[in-house]
């Protein structure tokens, strides 16, 4: 049976360092552990999940552009690009695919420069401060919204 929906998971700079990078803020799970868990959850929901992590803004933008005709929903942890990248915002708007912005830490309880996101006001939703569970909540929400609209 074919997958019902296609979800794209994008992770921005330094997310590849999860598990060892400031575990008090970002938790102890590695990115591979998070992606493996989410891939299993997606399979149980009968949806496909593609993943890209990049420290390069252009690579994330290129993958967003490639998603235009074959992805139903995007889950994105833009990491520091949330606070700096008009280009990622423009790419997301250009493809017109609904997306949920995810942050492991509560960005609103951190430094002032982390409290503004160029993506939040155009996102379908924002999840922050719930650690790795935020990815699961985003996936569940995306599938629920897609199921309701199809």
From Swiss-Prot:
Name the cystine pairs: none
* Biological or metabolic pathway of the protein: Metabolic intermediate biosynthesis; chorismate biosynthesis; chorismate from D-erythrose 4-phosphate and phosphoenolpyruvate: step 3/7
Q: Which domain of life is it from?
A: Bacteria
Q: What enzyme category does the UniProt record give?
A: lyase
> Pfam families per the record?
DHquinase_II
Active site, UniProt feature: 26, 103
| The protein's Enzyme Commission number | 4.2.1.10
Which Gene3D superfamilies does the entry mention? Dehydroquinase, class II
Please give the catalytic activity noted in the UniProt record: 3-dehydroquinate = 3-dehydroshikimate + H2O
PROSITE patterns named in the record? DEHYDROQUINASE_II
Q: Which residues bind substrate?
A: 77, 83, 90, 104-105, 114
Xref: InterPro entries: DHquinase_II, DHquinase_II_CS, DHquinase_II_sf
Sorted alphabetically, the keyword list is:
Amino-acid biosynthesis, Aromatic amino acid biosynthesis, Lyase
Gene Ontology biological process terms, A to Z: amino acid biosynthetic process; aromatic amino acid family biosynthetic process; chorismate biosynthetic process; quinate catabolic process
Assembly behavior: Homododecamer.
Protein family membership: Belongs to the type-II 3-dehydroquinase family.
Function noted in UniProt: Catalyzes a trans-dehydration via an enolate intermediate.
Q: What is this protein called?
A: 3-dehydroquinate dehydratase
Native source species: Klebsiella pneumoniae (strain 342)
Q: Which gene encodes it?
A: aroQ
């Amino acid at each position: 049976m074919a997958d019902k929906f296609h979800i794209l998971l994008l992770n921005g700079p330094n997310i590849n360092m999860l598990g060892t990078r400031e575990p008090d803020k970002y938790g102890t799970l590695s990115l591979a552990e998070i992606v493996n868990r989410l891939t299993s959850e997606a399979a149980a929901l009968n949806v496909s999940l593609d993943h890209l992590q990049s420290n390069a803004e252009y690579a994330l933008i290129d993958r967003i552009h490639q998603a235009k005709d074959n992805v139903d929903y995007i889950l994105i942890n833009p990491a520091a690009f949330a606070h700096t990248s008009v280009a990622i915002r423009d790419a997301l708007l250009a493809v017109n695919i609904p997306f949920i912005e995810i942050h492991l830490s509560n960005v609103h309880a951190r430094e002032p420069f982390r409290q503004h996101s160029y993506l939040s006001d155009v996102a379908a939703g924002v999840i922050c401060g719930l650690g790795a569970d935020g990815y699961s909540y985003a996936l569940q929400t995306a599938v629920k919204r897609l199921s309701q609209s199809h």
